[in-house]
Amino acid sequence: MPVKFSRAALASAGLSALFLGVYGACNWITSLRSDVGTLYFWWERYIPFVPIMVIPYLSIDLFFVGAPFLCRSEKELATFAKRVTAAILVAGGCFLLFPLRFAFARPHTGGWIGALFDWFRGMDMPYNMLPSLHIALRTFLGAIYARHTSGIVRLASNTWFSLIAISTLLTYQHHTMDLVGGFALAGYCFYTFQENRIRLPVIANRRIGFYYLIGALILAVIILVFRRWSYLLLWPGISFGIVAGAYFGAGPGIFRKTDGQLPWSTWWTLGPCLLGQRLSLLYYRLQCRPWDEVAPGVWIGRTLSNREASSAVRAGVTAVLDLTAEFSEAKAFRAISYHNIPILDLTAPSQEQLREMAAFISEQSEKGIVYVHCKIGYSRSAAAVGAYLLASGKCGSVEDVVALLRQVRPSIIIRPEALAALRHLKVALVQKTLSS
């Protein structure tokens, strides 16, 4: 639904008022305190002061006011407004809970540039530092202006928003950690507020969820005890907490995987957990072959690099069934017939998903070779291929499925929940046969 001008104008005015109110109130409250510290690196004293950079610094106001008018749908406008609102409120809370001020004296500047500095510094104070709300907002704005421009205009837009980011340092408005915090805040807001959120089915595994939750709680205790630089542990702590929620029932949708790829906001938000998954893949890939043939036209294997995927395509793979939620698919595989049914690691597919997997494998194996994979090519892949073997009649029982899979892929590990799902499917297939 197109955005009415009045709606865009209301959003622009409302967001501007929210920013001015929260930012100004936090500045004023902090100015009344005597316990305001600083946070910076020693080498930041050598960052030059560049007066002309006040122009890109102040230009963000114009882009901010104009952004809602670029939105082409109510959903896009609502998502933008939610991100900006959340960033302002979260940043405001941080300004009050962890007040900081700029550590250095800001040089006096003459001429018309000096007049600009005098004007905006008359309304500003050296507080509201971490996270940099200026950085968070320019990240939202940069994304929306890039979406609605192209060619040389987009290049100019991206360049200007890069200058806005740099200007926060070169005008002595922020320290380096403020910028890191601002980008982090923007990443969390991008991750949390999506235009299209899909609820994916999940079979919960509370035991794994508790492991992640315990890890998050341990990090929280460390942060509360040691403070200061231990706040950096918020990153893995939040990551563990979100993944714990996935295993308790939120499901694989936490990875936001779309068209076979994880967005950058997921890489940031869940980075520590994704790093753990990557290290796990590197370890297990030494324990097994890349892929094995289970039946004519059906291969089972692990997540492949783009080079390995290209080799598989040259070897005859024409379709891919990707069961991972936590990895981006290789470009070579996304270029052929690609289907993603995201299943959380260490969980089993639902019965509906097993039927969907079996149907895809059956259809694609008649046209060429279908490559079925999860992270390592073990339990999730075994469930998918097992569903196909049972549904097609190539195996008469779950025990036959297990025997065949272990014969062709000796290192395979099939988790109890995957076996239980296959047994449930087998019962349903038998009942369907008897009733027909």
Describe the residue ranges of each PLM region.
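Aromatic-anchored segments of alpha-helical transmembrane domains
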Residues: 20-21, 89-96, 159-171, 216-223, ...
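Structural signal for the C-terminal ends of transmembrane alpha-helices
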Residues: 67-75, 144-149, 189-197, 224-226, ...
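Membrane-interface helix-boundary motifs at transmembrane edges
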Residues: 3-7, 69-81, 147-152, 199-204, ...
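PTP/DSP superfamily signal
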Residues: 197-282, 289, 311, 358-369, ...
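N-terminal transmembrane-helix/juxtamembrane module of multi-pass inner/ER membrane proteins
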Residues: 1-63, 106-108, 117, 249-262, ...
